[in-house]
């Protein structure tokens, strides 16, 4: 995991002219990937994913990779930062920013236009604002102290630390397991003890578009998509991951589909309990995504919101008009 301090990361983020980054963000099930692919196909662009779970190989149905959507008229639109690490590992913000810059520089060096697309607000904001990152070591003593605490107690501790740090790094409602909560507390504690010097940020030059979907339509699409993913073999996918040696605790750590379906597979939940709890969790997740994006606006990011109900042609024309 990484800590954020808004200052230039290194020399290649400082004073170097950069191609303006097109960014498309929005909550889950709003159609942002389809829009990014259609726009990329029209502009000859390449897509950089901003999804914290699509980086994992073999985690396909549960993360909604839908790689067939990147093919338009038989031609694949190039994409980056999907399927780059093994399941069971812990990918983090520090690695994402490093990998993003490598992909961005590669795309620009070939004269192409990069499009950043995803729903992981923390990743997007760190890239757009050019946050400097440093790794946070594990704190065995603190972990031992927190071991055995309930998720409710851990969440309250995290809230108190966030207030002390004036931190927006961790959305407490995203911390849906004790393992995640302990790591978040570890990071916030480190931040409190190692206050970083604040300097002006060196942002990536970007124009940001958001897809605004009607709340009830979003809920309908989320529920429909969950049924489709289960029908398409999401349970079998998670069984395969477990059979390949990925620990249940690692899959639970990834949250949402991987948390609840794993708990079903190992017998902790019935199918009906899994389905009901997972559906609620995804709806809550989409709400938290919108909360983060609104927070980005309050922190100075200008987001041009597009009605998700518009036809694809109108959305693309509106984006092109503003480029």
Task: Please name every model-derived segment.
Residues 1-323:
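Phosphate/pyrophosphate-binding catalytic cores of soluble transferases and nucleic-acid-acting enzymes
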């Amino acid at each position: 995991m990484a800590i954020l301090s808004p200052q230039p990361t290194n020399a290649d983020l400082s004073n170097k002219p950069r191609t303006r980054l097109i960014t498309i963000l929005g909550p889950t099930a709003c159609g942002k990937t389809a829009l990014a692919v259609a726009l990329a196909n029209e502009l000859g662009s390449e897509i950089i994913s901003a999804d914290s779970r699509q980086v994992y190989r073999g985690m396909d149905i549960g993360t909604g990779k839908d790689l067939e959507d990147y093919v338009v008229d038989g031609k694949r639109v190039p994409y980056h930062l999907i399927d780059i690490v093994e399941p069971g590992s812990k990918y983090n913000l520090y690695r994402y920013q490093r990998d993003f810059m490598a992909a961005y520089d590669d795309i620009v060096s070939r004269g192409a236009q990069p499009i950043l697309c995803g729903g992981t607000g923390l990743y997007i904001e760190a890239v757009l604002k050019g946050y400097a990152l440093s790794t946070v070591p594990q704190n065995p003593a603190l972990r031992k102290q927190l071991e055995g605490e309930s998720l409710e107690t851990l969440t309250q501790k995290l809230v108190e630390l966030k207030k002390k740090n004036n931190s927006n790094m961790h959305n407490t409602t995203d911390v849906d397991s004790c393992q995640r909560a302990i790591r978040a507390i570890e990071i916030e504690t480190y931040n409190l003890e190692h206050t970083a010097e604040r300097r002006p940020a060196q942002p990536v030059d970007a124009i940001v578009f958001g897809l605004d979907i009607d709340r009830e339509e979003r809920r309908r699409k989320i529920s429909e998509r969950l049924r489709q993913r289960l029908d398409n073999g999401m349970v079998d996918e998670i069984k395969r991951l477990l059979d390949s040696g990925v620990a249940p605790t690692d899959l639970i750590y990834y949250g949402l589909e991987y948390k609840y379906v794993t708990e079903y597979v190992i017998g902790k939940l019935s199918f009906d309990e899994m389905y009901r709890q997972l559906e609620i969790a995804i709806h809550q997740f989409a709400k938290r995504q919108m909360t983060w994006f609104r927070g980005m606006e309050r922190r100075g990011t200008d987001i041009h919101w597009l009605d998700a109900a518009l036809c694809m042609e109108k959305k693309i024309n509106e984006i092109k008009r503003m480029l």
